[in-house]
Amino acid sequence: MIEDELDRILSDIARYGGMCFPSKVKVYAPTCNNTCIQAVEKLYRRITELFGGATVYKGAIGTFVDPVRGVVEEEPVWVIEAAHNCLTPAEARSFAEALREYAEEARQNYIAVSQGSFYVLPSESLAKRFKT
């Protein structure tokens, strides 16, 4: 599905040896102020295995309002991102199970997940399409 001019250009280039993943998923995994790093690393490994690769941004900071005290808290968060071509029901269950295990091990009440398009394009095709 072409959403805008950038999507049109990227999908055109992807036809010449690139890849277009119709979806990407991002998981925002708090590190419990670095006390549950093992749980976050395990989640990252599971996502990498399930999706065939992932990117992690380790320098993010997440904030939330403590509902009891009304105070804004912040802590380090790993943003784990992976592209995919639609999961099978079994793969989707495996992903949900990985999220559940992380949440349990890290003692998280909530885990943020988002989804959208993601392109992987060959540089050579990009260079040919946009010669200066």
Which residues make up each language-model segment?
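Positively charged, small/polar-rich N-terminal and surface patches that mediate targeting and assembly
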Residues: I2-T132
